[in-house]
Structures are given as structure tokens and as C-alpha cells.
Amino acid sequence: MKKIRLELVYLRAIICAIIIITHLLTQITLKHENMEGGSLVLQFYIRNIVIFGTPCFIILSQLLTTLNYQKVTYRYLTTRVKYILIPYILMGLFYSYSESLLTDSSFNKQFIENVLLGQWYGYFIVVIMQFFILSYIIFKINYNLFNSKILLLLSFILQQSFLYYFTNNTAFHDTVLHYYPLSENTIIFGWIFYFFLGAYMGYNYERVLNFLERYLVIMIVLAVATYFVFIALANGDYWNVTSFSYSLTPYNSIMFIVILGICTHFKTILFNTIQMISAFSFFIYLLHPIILDSLFAYTNIFEDNTMVFLAISLLFILGLCIGVGMILREFYIFRFIIGKQPYKLNINAY
């Protein structure tokens, strides 16, 4: 029986909330499309502070894989097709239909561009599915490769080199997009280090926890330092905020480690709520952008007080997504929409 690791339950819930906050801050920026000067720069740096959500989900996904498995069968892939890829497609169908109505455009066009090519917020699932296949291949070769410091270093060099040239070399950028058919955000070379970092941490999980018990403060200082490095490397494009950036790789990676270290100190605080957010995190990730615009139309009245705006918006989004998820959970067939984790929740029946 797998040991329940409370720190990972808290970690998944916090990362989920961080992604929602990222999208809420984006909504504020989009509302003020004429923003410029100091206000735009401030928004840019605030948004980048919490941009680590998607990289952290990639790290966490692979950490859980190498932590819980030492060998895998073909069922490893089929399970992920059923409970990750199929929900992605089904929610994508709903999103494409709603977007076709909203924009008075073709459903087929919306589905192909968004779901098949990954030109929507769900692109992250396309990345994750590629890494599941890569993980399966490595398991079949040798599980101990996940413990390779050389592979970890090479993946860092590959990711940083790819992102640097993709961002700064027009010829390289255009050549890649000419031959790669999907959204640029789904190219795994731009995320490959996060995959191997998660794998390495999962393989050495107890050692990682022991390290964080002693050196968490140092990691927090490093997180601040790497963010200042990002500031120094900023290119002046204050509208474009993305985690698909070489200058944010160290910061994103260290923030995952920092949050994991902080979560090791949580045992019971808001545990029932945290447990539900964690269990429904995949469904929340897919559903919340669909309702975000409508909800923002109300909550933006609190925009002048950013903390109040974020707190109320986060509460409503989590409440709506979990509420819908709890209703769907009553019917086992909806595991192909909400995933299988919600069915593991220990909820008393009356």
C-alpha cells in the first residue's frame, strides 16, 4: 500500500492555486490593454513571481512517477490515456464548442487549432503526455537512469540552449516552427530539464526531504537571487509573460523545491479543503479558464485591492470547480472527465 505523503497533497493544491492566480493576474493586464510605463513593468514582474505553476506540475508529475514506480508495464500508458488524455479531449470539445459560439467561428477550426495543435491553455497536457511516453521508454531501458546527474546536467544544457536560441535567433525560431506542427509551447525541449529534475527528486526523495530539513532557508535565498537574475536578463517586452523562458528556469526549479520544503511543515492546516483541491486539481486546471472571463466580469470590481480581488476570485473558482466536480463524481462514468483522483477521496456517505 502506497504511503500517503501529506506534503505532496499540499504541494499539488498550492501549485493548482498558483496557476489560477497567474491567470487572474493575466486577466487584469488584458483588461488594461493601454497600460504602459511603470504600471506595466510592475505588473510584469509581479506576474512572473507566480509563473512557476506549469513547470512545477511537470516536475511533480515525474517526481510522483519515479517515487511510486521502479518498473512499469504497458498499463502505465493506457491508464494515462484514459484518465488524462481522454479528459483533455472531452474538455477540449466543450471548450471548442463554447468558443465557436462565442466567436461565431467554425467548431472544426476551434477544435483543430486548440485541442489538436495545442493553441490553448490545455497545451500543458500535450507536454505531459509526451513525457509519459519518454518516461515509459526510460523505465524499459534502465530505471537507474533517473538517478543520473549527467542526464540531469545535459537536460539543463539542452533546455537552456533551445530556449535561448528559440527566443533570440529568428532563423532558428522560424525553422523550428516550420517543421514542428503543434503549438510552440508543446515542444518538450523547452521543458525537458523539469522532467529530469522531477525524476531525480522522486528517485532520491528521502534524501531531498533531509536536505530541505537542513537547508530550506538557503533555498529561499537562492529563489530570491535567481529571480533577480531573471530581472537582469529581462529584454523589455513587458507584455509577454511565459514560463517557456530560459531566464526563468533556475527560478522555477528552485521555487518547486522551496514550496516542497515549506509543505513538509504542514500536517493538518485546512486539510479537508486541501485534500479536495489536490484531488480535483486536474479538473480545476481544465475547467477554470472556461469560467474565468465570466467570473472576472464580477470580481474585477475589487481590482483596486489586489489581495481582496485574488482571494475572492480564488475562492469562487475553486468552489465552482470542486462543486461541479463533486456532482460529476457521483457518476463513475465521469472519471473520463474529472480523472480518477477524486474517486480516491474518503468522503463519508450518509
From Swiss-Prot:
GO cellular component entries: plasma membrane
Membrane keyword on record: yes
Entry membrane topology: Multi-pass membrane protein
Gene Ontology MF: a single term: O-acetyltransferase activity
Transmembrane segments: 7-29, 44-66, 79-101, 116-138, 145-167, 187-204, 211-233, 243-262, 269-291, 306-328
Disulphide bonds in the chain: none
Localization per record: Cell membrane
Keyword Transmembrane: yes
Keyword field: Cell membrane, Membrane, Transmembrane, Transmembrane helix, Transport
InterPro entries reported for this sequence: Acyl_transf_3_dom
GO biological-process terms attached to the record: enterobacterial common antigen biosynthetic process
Annotated signal peptide: none
PANTHER family: O-ACETYLTRANSFERASE WECH (PTHR40074:SF2)
Function: Presumably involved in the export of the biofilm adhesin polysaccharide poly-beta-1,6-N-acetyl-D-glucosamine (PNAG, also referred to as PIA) across the cell membrane.
Family: Belongs to the acyltransferase 3 family.
Name of the protein this chain belongs to: Probable poly-beta-1,6-N-acetyl-D-glucosamine export protein
Source organism (scientific name): Staphylococcus aureus (strain Mu50 / ATCC 700699)
Source lineage: Bacteria, Bacillati, Bacillota, Bacilli, Bacillales
